Amino acid sequence: MAKGEGNVIAQNKKARHDYTIVDTVEAGMVLTGTEIKSIRAGRINLKDGFAQIKQGEAWLVNVHIAPYDEGNIWNQEPTRTRKLLLRKKQIESLDNEVKGTGMTLVPLKVYIKDGFAKVLIGLAKGKHDYDKRESIKRREQDRDIKRTMKAINSR
């Protein structure tokens, strides 16, 4: 399967609005049993999350996975830091990009692929307010063009 394909559980739509996504990387997550059950139930929130690289390892920070209802004592803290599974070269290249150009790593979506939970991490650059307004104008213009083309073609 290509990057990002699978049973999509959660998406971070706010990230696409606030950031310009330059590149994406698929990563596995180190989870406990109750966390994967909670993710399969769709109880995950990516909105405030980000990824960072510390001492040659990638970590997913501030992603909220709700406690599993039947988890009892095996439930973990909902916003704990989770390790991301990437190859060493991928980690090094992401680290160089983040340190060199002032970009950040944001989770774009979580999905189940071949029975494993994967997260699509985006290498992103923050947008200014005027960039956001420009994106909205461009999107509205594209919609208007499509509407007029559809009206012309349906005659």
Swiss-Prot record:
Similarity comment: Belongs to the SmpB family.
Coiled-coil spans in chain: none
GO molecular function, one term: RNA binding
Pfam families referenced in this protein's UniProt entry, alphabetically: SmpB (PF01668)
UniProt entry tagged with the keyword Cytoplasm: yes
InterPro entries: SmpB (IPR023620), SsrA-bd_prot (IPR000037), SsrA-bd_prot_CS (IPR020081)
GO cellular component: cytosol
Name of the protein described by the UniProt record: SsrA-binding protein
Keyword Magnesium among record annotations: no
GO biological process: trans-translation
Annotated keywords: Cytoplasm, RNA-binding
Natural source organism: Streptococcus suis (strain 05ZYH33)
Subcellular location(s) of the protein: Cytoplasm
Lineage: superkingdom: Bacteria
